[in-house]
Amino acid sequence: MTPAVAAPPPPRSTNPVVRITEDLRRERAVGVPFPPGDTRFSMARTMGFLRDPLTLLLGAYERYGPVFTLRVFHQNVVFMLGPAANHYILVSDAANFSWRDGHYHDLIPFLGDGLLSIDGDFHWQSRRAMLPMFHRERIAASQKLMVDEVEAAMDRWHDGMRVDVYAWTRELALRIAMRALFGMDPDRATARHDAAHEFEEALGFWSKDYILQLMRGPGTPWARMQAARRNLDEIVYAELTRRRASGEHGDDLLGLLLDTQDGDGLTLSDRHIRDQVMTLMFAGHDTTTSTVAFLFYELARNPGLADAADFDLDLAVDETLRLYPPAWVGPRRSVAPFEFAGVAVPGGVPVEYSSWASHHLPDVWDEPFAFKPERFAPGRREQLPKGAYVPFGGGSRTCIGMRFGQAEIGVIARAILRRFRLDLEPGYRMHVRQMPTIGPKHGLPVTVRASAPAAGLEPATALVA
């Protein structure tokens, strides 16, 4: 009998009362002080964390330094900010921090045991199985597909047309993922509608107020998310069954996972494949869509930048990811006690780093709230300290789809800039939502203007060398 892939530990209860009670029990069991900070419950602080966590975290950094405690929701959380803190958590002492026990655990009921929510051998084994799909050569081969999809979508644009770039990119990114990663035909109406509708329905759970997320029962956001998950499962499992029956697994991510065997003869179960599919759809979908929207928001706020002779789109994308890193917080739980920057941190407590806050520290970045792509120019990027710039995480947990996402963002942005300028709708104000990733809360409504190509743009197909 073929042995199964290494199994993850069982997830915690999805009952919010049980989970909150367990969190409080674990906190009482710590028995030693938390780092300095604001450790008494405050509704104002909790609401501030929900509405504007960046301001809250930067203020605490000024008061307490790079390691501090904030009581948000029902428990104390240790935050560690700055380049050295990021490097410590992501690279030098990464083994002392559990992902599965951080608050990304909240995603397990939808995503399952994908790369975001697993640790140890199970994470390493799963990541190794998928790495070939994200080699540079495979991504380069996917670029023509990306270009075809983008050009077809843009052929419907015309001068003076109003477009929500965020919504437009969400549809486009889903089509690209369906074709490039999963070999599914997005023009098969049932597949496209079902996948897109159910995926958006599921993600809508995390956009609801926190109190609504805690509710259970018919008609609640939780019930709608679970129904969407079941419908998505039917789509994925049906495709896996079809491929196994035909004997043709395909040359995409699904086929790669179906064919996977490691040196010990371990294979991946359908459930494991499903969990990785959902996780990659979630991570890649929101990263691409939000970054493209924020990029064109900043270009519209800085008129003439894209027309400058020295404009470099890659630098502009890097700067966009600095200002708006999609995965803005990295939740963990410490395995054992440790000391950082002279501050003792207990074992068994929530510990989080924040790329968003670290990317806005004035002692690291000149004019941290300004859009300045030149800060990533050759010679300047190398001067950044380790851990200063971490939009895709770092170490063994660096986003596996980073190159695919960068290629996709580049193809979409180059195609737009070669044909159009996007002007913000009068009176538009950007409101950033934080959950489950950073994105424009109210989309990005623009007016499309026909334009000469922006300066310095190489063809999209030259992006991946």
Task: Write out the residue ranges for each language-model feature.
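N-terminal membrane-proximal hinge/A-helix region immediately C-terminal to the signal-anchor transmembrane segment
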Residues: 2-125, 144-152, 187, 228, ...
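Cytochrome P450 heme-thiolate monooxygenase catalytic core
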Residues: 2-12, 16-31, 99-104, 122, ...
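Cytochrome P450 proximal C-terminal region
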Residues: 2-12, 18, 30, 61, ...
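Conserved cytochrome P450 K-helix E-x-x-R motif and the immediately C-terminal K′/meander segment
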Residues: 45-65, 238, 310-343, 362
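Cytochrome P450 catalytic-core helices
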Residues: 287-307, 403-420
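Conserved cytochrome P450 K-helix/beta-meander segment immediately N-terminal to the heme-binding cysteine loop
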Residues: 353-381
